[in-house]
Design a protein with these regions (language model features):
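Conserved alpha-helical "signature site"
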Residues: 1-118
Length: 118
Protein backbone atom coordinates (compact mmCIF):
# COMPACT_ATOMS: atom_id res chain seq x y z
CA UNK A 1 0.00 0.00 0.00
CA UNK A 2 2.86 2.36 0.81
CA UNK A 3 4.37 1.95 -2.67
CA UNK A 4 0.98 2.59 -4.27
CA UNK A 5 0.55 5.72 -2.14
CA UNK A 6 3.93 7.06 -3.24
CA UNK A 7 3.20 6.36 -6.91
CA UNK A 8 -0.25 7.93 -6.54
CA UNK A 9 1.22 11.03 -4.91
CA UNK A 10 3.93 11.46 -7.51
CA UNK A 11 1.51 10.90 -10.39
CA UNK A 12 -0.85 13.52 -9.01
CA UNK A 13 2.06 15.92 -8.55
CA UNK A 14 3.21 15.44 -12.16
CA UNK A 15 -0.30 15.78 -13.59
CA UNK A 16 -0.96 18.89 -11.51
CA UNK A 17 2.30 20.39 -12.80
CA UNK A 18 0.74 20.38 -16.28
CA UNK A 19 -2.20 22.56 -15.24
CA UNK A 20 -1.80 24.18 -11.83
CA UNK A 21 0.58 26.76 -10.35
CA UNK A 22 3.80 25.22 -9.00
CA UNK A 23 2.83 25.86 -5.38
CA UNK A 24 -0.19 23.56 -5.79
CA UNK A 25 1.87 20.56 -6.90
CA UNK A 26 2.93 19.74 -3.33
CA UNK A 27 -0.71 19.68 -2.27
CA UNK A 28 -1.51 17.35 -5.17
CA UNK A 29 1.22 15.00 -3.92
CA UNK A 30 -0.26 15.09 -0.41
CA UNK A 31 -3.73 14.27 -1.75
CA UNK A 32 -2.34 11.27 -3.59
CA UNK A 33 -0.38 9.88 -0.65
CA UNK A 34 -3.04 10.62 1.96
CA UNK A 35 -5.80 9.11 -0.19
CA UNK A 36 -4.61 5.70 1.02
CA UNK A 37 -4.12 6.72 4.64
CA UNK A 38 -7.28 4.92 5.70
CA UNK A 39 -6.00 1.67 4.22
CA UNK A 40 -2.53 2.12 5.72
CA UNK A 41 -3.88 2.87 9.22
CA UNK A 42 -6.96 0.65 9.01
CA UNK A 43 -9.26 3.46 10.15
CA UNK A 44 -11.81 5.59 8.27
CA UNK A 45 -10.16 8.39 6.29
CA UNK A 46 -12.03 11.09 8.18
CA UNK A 47 -10.67 9.77 11.48
CA UNK A 48 -7.16 9.40 10.06
CA UNK A 49 -7.19 13.06 8.99
CA UNK A 50 -8.54 14.45 12.29
CA UNK A 51 -5.10 15.09 13.75
CA UNK A 52 -3.52 16.43 10.57
CA UNK A 53 -3.74 20.10 9.57
CA UNK A 54 -4.33 20.16 5.83
CA UNK A 55 -5.34 22.94 3.44
CA UNK A 56 -9.07 22.94 2.71
CA UNK A 57 -8.66 21.99 -0.98
CA UNK A 58 -6.74 18.87 0.09
CA UNK A 59 -9.43 17.91 2.60
CA UNK A 60 -12.16 18.60 0.03
CA UNK A 61 -10.59 16.20 -2.46
CA UNK A 62 -9.92 13.50 0.13
CA UNK A 63 -13.19 13.53 2.03
CA UNK A 64 -15.71 14.87 -0.48
CA UNK A 65 -14.24 14.23 -3.93
CA UNK A 66 -14.59 17.92 -4.74
CA UNK A 67 -12.35 20.84 -5.56
CA UNK A 68 -9.33 21.42 -7.72
CA UNK A 69 -7.54 18.17 -6.82
CA UNK A 70 -10.52 15.81 -7.12
CA UNK A 71 -10.24 15.20 -10.87
CA UNK A 72 -6.52 14.47 -10.55
CA UNK A 73 -7.27 11.89 -7.85
CA UNK A 74 -10.02 10.36 -9.98
CA UNK A 75 -7.69 10.15 -12.98
CA UNK A 76 -4.93 8.63 -10.87
CA UNK A 77 -7.27 5.96 -9.52
CA UNK A 78 -8.44 5.22 -13.07
CA UNK A 79 -4.81 4.72 -14.13
CA UNK A 80 -4.29 2.26 -11.27
CA UNK A 81 -7.45 0.27 -11.88
CA UNK A 82 -7.40 0.29 -15.67
CA UNK A 83 -10.78 2.02 -15.82
CA UNK A 84 -10.55 3.17 -19.43
CA UNK A 85 -13.90 4.99 -19.49
CA UNK A 86 -13.11 7.11 -16.42
CA UNK A 87 -9.55 7.65 -17.65
CA UNK A 88 -10.80 8.98 -21.00
CA UNK A 89 -13.52 11.14 -19.46
CA UNK A 90 -11.35 12.78 -16.79
CA UNK A 91 -8.30 13.21 -19.02
CA UNK A 92 -10.58 14.94 -21.53
CA UNK A 93 -12.08 17.17 -18.81
CA UNK A 94 -8.56 18.16 -17.74
CA UNK A 95 -7.44 18.59 -21.37
CA UNK A 96 -4.62 16.09 -20.84
CA UNK A 97 -3.59 13.77 -23.65
CA UNK A 98 -3.13 10.03 -23.18
CA UNK A 99 0.55 10.60 -23.85
CA UNK A 100 0.83 13.18 -21.06
CA UNK A 101 -0.92 10.95 -18.54
CA UNK A 102 0.94 7.79 -19.53
CA UNK A 103 4.30 9.59 -19.46
CA UNK A 104 3.52 10.95 -15.98
CA UNK A 105 2.46 7.48 -14.80
CA UNK A 106 5.71 5.92 -16.06
CA UNK A 107 7.71 8.72 -14.42
CA UNK A 108 5.88 8.18 -11.13
CA UNK A 109 6.52 4.43 -11.22
CA UNK A 110 10.21 4.95 -11.98
CA UNK A 111 10.52 7.56 -9.23
CA UNK A 112 8.96 5.23 -6.68
CA UNK A 113 11.31 2.41 -7.71
CA UNK A 114 14.29 4.75 -7.31
CA UNK A 115 13.13 5.54 -3.77
CA UNK A 116 13.20 1.83 -2.98
CA UNK A 117 16.68 1.50 -4.43
CA UNK A 118 15.55 -1.04 -7.02
Amino acid sequence: VGQTAVVRGRLMELLAAELLPPEECDNAFVVGVFSLLDTMLNVPLEKALESVALPQPVTDALLHGTGVFAPFLELTKACESGDDATFARVADELHLSNRQVNWAHLQALAWAEDLNGD
